[in-house]
Amino acid sequence: MAGFMNRMPSFLIEDQLRSGTISVIVGVDEVGYGAIAGPVVAAAVYLPERECDYIKDIKDSKALSSKKREELFCKITAHAKYGVGFARVREIEQHNILVASHISMKRALQNLGVKADLVLVDGSRAPAGLPWAVKTIVKGDSISTSIAAASIIAKVTRDRFMRRLHEQYPEYAWNQNCGYGTKAHMQSLKLYGKTAQHRSTFAPVKQLSSECEGAPPEQLELLSSTGIKTPVDGRGDAVATRD
């Protein structure tokens, strides 16, 4: 794992796949898959400008400090084309986390605003039924700069969202744990019970008998605070995109 975390991604795989019919190559990644609270968030990113100084600093979001992620987020969103998609807790409960993560990826791509020739997806499984050519890449956020950029956009967007949720549910310290099952988070679950933002079908939450259902927040209002454009699609789902 350490080897992947320290690896600097590049455009090597993009260049290998580029051809006469493939020029617009988009990276896709998600974050929040293993959390026990909050949505799963995906981002799709197309980097048309490779010579910008910030490009060399892009790497897997997990290998970056929060400060560095925020810095790169601002630079990527200023120069790249991107889309963000959310799959909410009720969708995770209705389907499962894998399906929900694929839903978020589809929404990110649908709101990218760019016609992709090829989509690079982090992981071993891609959403079914995409109208674009797709290639999955295991540990793609450590290999492809396009996927690494998507990991940064998804991570910062979700972290900002969870910090705003923290204002409504301060007992769970989501501003620190971002909805993941830390020891402190689990202790708060035992003490206060679960909220509407907890994933009830996930074992750590399901095992707790006490419940404290709260009204779900207005997602569009929260998303607007992240600094990303947030139109609402035909299903009423909040999405994000950059022109």
From Swiss-Prot:
Compositionally skewed regions (Basic and acidic residues) per UniProt: 232-243
Keyword presence, Manganese: yes
Root EC class: hydrolase
Gene3D superfamilies: Ribonuclease H-like superfamily/Ribonuclease H (3.30.420.10)
Localization (cell): Cytoplasm
Cofactor comment text: Manganese or magnesium. Binds 1 divalent metal ion per monomer in the absence of substrate. May bind a second metal ion after substrate binding.
Classification via HAMAP family: RNase_HII_B
Job of this protein: Endonuclease that specifically degrades the RNA of RNA-DNA hybrids.
Designated name of the protein: Ribonuclease HII
Species of provenance: Anaplasma marginale (strain St. Maries)
